[in-house]
Amino acid sequence: MKDRGMTNTPLSSSELVNTMSHFHRAEIGRMAGWRDRLDRTTNWAITVAAAMLSISLSTPTSHHGVLLFAMLLILLLLWIEARRYRFFDVYRTRVRQFERYYFAQIFSPQSDFAADWLLIFGESLRAPKFLMSQWAAFTRRLRRNYIYMFLILLLAWVLKITTPSLQAEGAERNFVNSLREAVANASLGPLPGWLIVTSLVLFYLVLTGAAFLTRSKDGELGYGEVHV
């Protein structure tokens, strides 16, 4: 006797409804799992930023390089979160396809509204693929969360190099009187201050461009104002 699982026998209406409901529930679970991973990565980044801010600003003996190191750690966590976001986006898209093409059609039917969506959905199950690049995921997470952490770290770094009371003992207890003094305070070991400042300016220009100049209406923002 042939295995029923290998035949092309169509499902009855009740079997189809059960299959759709169970599969939708399963995809919500997978989406929620990856959403939790995203939140945990963001929480790690916030914790790292808060810890480094506390270390750097709590004592004059702490070097401003601590904040530069914090920026590198946040960048690493952002890259990890972008990778996780690509997985999350796959399952989020499947859930939204169910909502947009199946449930929405039940509640508010429209004629010939993506009638072949199940065929496209089936092919995506046979050969799952990422729906966005690593760079696109990177810029999206940067724009929504991480740009604010980088901004806070930058403001703290500027405060650190321009306020002698937050630097090592021996410095005068007043704000720097010129840009040259601030640049000199930004030196890091054998690296001169101008090199550190220039590198940081370029780094933040790239971040700003990635966050706001690469913005597009692709994804859920193309269908409404609500996104995850």
Where are these regions (language model features)?
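Transmembrane helix interruption/hinge and helix-loop junction motifs
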Residues: 57-65
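Solvent-exposed, non-transmembrane helices and loops of integral membrane proteins
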Residues: 5-16, 96-133, 222-227
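Cytosolic-side membrane-entry/anchor segment at the start of a transmembrane helix
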Residues: 7-58, 190-194
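Hydrophobic core of alpha-helical transmembrane segments in multi-pass integral membrane proteins
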Residues: 151-159, 194-212
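Membrane-interfacial helical/loop segments at transmembrane boundaries in membrane proteins
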Residues: 167-185
